Each structure stands twice: as structure tokens, then as C-alpha cells.
Amino acid sequence: MTRTDTRAGVGALGEQLAVDYLQGLGLRVLARNWRCRYGELDVVVADDAVQAVVFVEVKTRTTDRFGGVAEAVTPVKVRRLRRLAGLWLSEQDARWESVRLDVVTVRIGQGRSPELTHIEGVG
């Protein structure tokens, strides 16, 4: 198994843990790994309680070597997510009262339970 395969596996595990967590909050998954020429949206969910669509960036970490939660999503990344969200919305027939960008960070490592942090409204 290559380092790339390992990273992809860790990322996929983190994303699944994030989706399970979001569904546990009562959010409904609309899309996963939506791609276009400008990038990818990790997870798109509906918060039916407030008629909102939420675009969720999932960051999975095995160490803090590349920064923690605060460094997970930069202003440049937020701008890119906004653009992608707009493109995704333009393809939808449904309309929502509000739109939100969230981040879920997942820390996983050997011998410990995964730790999830959910930051709502990052941009």
C-alpha cells in the first residue's frame, strides 16, 4: 500500500465518520464528493429543521503536524467553497431559506477513539 493509498483511506474513514455524525444530528445527506472542474465539495447536507443547505468541508488529521482545527480551512479555501457551493446550487431545483459552510475535523490515531470537532458557519 502506498502513502497515497493510506492517505486516501484515512480521508475516506474521516469522511464516513463525519457523515455518521451529521446524520446523528438529524441532517440529511444530499451529496458526497460532488466534483466539477473547480474542485470538490466533501459533503452537502440539508438541515430540514431550519430549511438550510449546509456545505461541509471534512478535514481528517492523524497528527497536528499540519495544524489543528484553526488551520484546517483558510480564507482562500472558504472562497473556493463558496464558489463551489454556488455552482452546486445552480444545478438544483430545490430552494433553501439559508446556506451555511461548516467544517468537521476528525482526528484519528492508533489506540484512541476518533475526535470530531464541528464548526458551523465558517464563511
UniProtKB/Swiss-Prot annotation:
In its UniProt record, a GO molecular function of this protein is: nucleic acid binding
InterPro entries the UniProt entry points to: Restrct_endonuc-II-like, tRNA_endonuc-like_dom_sf, UPF0102_YraN-like
Q: Which residues cross the membrane?
A: none
Family stated for the protein in its record: Belongs to the UPF0102 family.
Q: Which PANTHER family did the record assign?
A: UPF0102 PROTEIN YRAN
The protein in question is named UPF0102 protein Mflv_4140
Q: What organism is listed for this UniProt entry?
A: Mycolicibacterium gilvum (strain PYR-GCK)
